């Protein structure tokens, strides 16, 4: 299954993207199409001794910058690397598109070229978080900041399907992020969403608090993109700060330094667990195809793992399973019934 990589997106493109693509092809045997400036990409590939690797180049004459307006750039820059990567998916020449460029443009390109899955009103960006018991999927982390209850219900279905078919969780437990576990907590959005989700076939556990995310008892955590992005950035900042604080304390005395020698292996394993590069990119859910959004400052390892994850995402037919799950749950009719009950109550 060939992966189209937007080689011109990202803070250090195309150097990091090319090296990550080469590593993915070499380590996982995944065929790659690099999309971008042909001459620059050819020169980058020459540095990596790629003879025998299934990597080709698709020329793109334009690049969407990090500060470009996402929707305008996609429409104006028809030959941009990110848009053409999704065009390759649409044409069946690649099974997924991976980009570390402008995340808004990546999402816009995916929606514009591949369109939304029937029954999905808004796309969502998901992210895997490390927990005490393994991994938890959180969505949305920034795709749609202003949501309605039906959007969150759709996110829950997409997250459940992804957790089941890509993460390999047999019966994913779904939770709705709120400011308390009691039914009386939350705001209008979460309370209405809670009512909807309780009527679905999902293994729904109700409200969860932010502190519960890392316990690992919930497999899929649902929230709007505004809250989700704050959760993501806070978690990244906390992990980085905790590591730096610990290092400062270790360096304060020779006793601490000596003790570190005995637990150095454990610290290395911990750093690996909280390193975003280990989890690759964030899947874009809700489009008729596969898109993977990477951090703008992604490392070679992050790009490599994002390509691997994109291949798994495509191989497991997530979009098709989402359609099946939507049909099974009749979310829109549930919302209409809920609205009627509220009208009667008023």
Swiss-Prot record:
Its EC number is 2.3.1.274. GO terms for molecular function: phosphate:acyl-[acyl carrier protein] acyltransferase activity. The keyword Transferase applies. One of its GO terms (biological process) is phospholipid biosynthetic process. GO terms for cellular component: cytoplasm. The keyword Cytoplasm applies. This is Phosphate acyltransferase.
């Amino acid at each position: 299954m060939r992966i189209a990589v937007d080689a011109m997106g990202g803070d250090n493109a195309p150097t990091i993207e090319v090296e990550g693509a080469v590593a993915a092809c070499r380590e996982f045997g995944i065929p790659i199409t690099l999309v971008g400036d042909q001459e620059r990409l050819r020169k980058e590939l020459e540095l990596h001794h790629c003879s025998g690797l299934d990597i080709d180049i698709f020329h793109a004459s334009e690049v969407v910058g990090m500060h470009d307006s996402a929707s305008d750039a996609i429409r104006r820059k028809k030959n941009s690397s990110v848009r053409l990567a999704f065009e390759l998916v649409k044409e069946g020449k690649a099974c997924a598109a991976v980009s570390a460029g402008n995340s808004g443009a990546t999402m816009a390109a995916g929606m514009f070229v591949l369109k939304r899955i029937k029954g999905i009103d808004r796309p969502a960006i998901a992210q895997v978080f490390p927990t005490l018991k393994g991994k938890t999927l959180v969505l949305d982390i920034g795709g749609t900041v202003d949501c309605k209850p039906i959007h969150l219900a759709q996110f829950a279905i997409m997250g459940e399907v992804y957790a089941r078919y890509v993460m390999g969780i047999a019966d994913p437990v779904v939770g709705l992020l709120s400011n308390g576990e009691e039914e009386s907590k939350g705001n209008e959005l979460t309370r209405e969403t809670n009512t909807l989700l309780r009527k679905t076939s999902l293994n729904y556990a109700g409200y969860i608090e932010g502190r519960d995310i890392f316990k690992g008892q919930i497999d899929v955590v649902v929230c709007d993109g505004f809250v989700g992005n704050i959760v993501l950035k806070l978690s990244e900042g906390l992990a980085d700060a905790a590591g730096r604080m610990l290092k400062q304390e270790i360096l304060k005395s020779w006793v601490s330094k000596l003790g570190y020698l005995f637990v150095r292996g454990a610290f290395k394993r911990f750093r690996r667990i909280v390193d975003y590069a280990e989890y690759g990119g964030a899947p874009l859910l809700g489009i008729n195809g596969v898109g993977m959004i990477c951090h703008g400052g992604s490392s070679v390892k992050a790009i490599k793992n994002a390509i691997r994850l994109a291949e798994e995402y495509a191989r497991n037919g997530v979009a098709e399973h989402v359609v099946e799950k939507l049909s099974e749950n009749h979310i829109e009719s549930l919302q209409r019934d809920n609205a009627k009950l509220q009208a009667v109550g008023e």
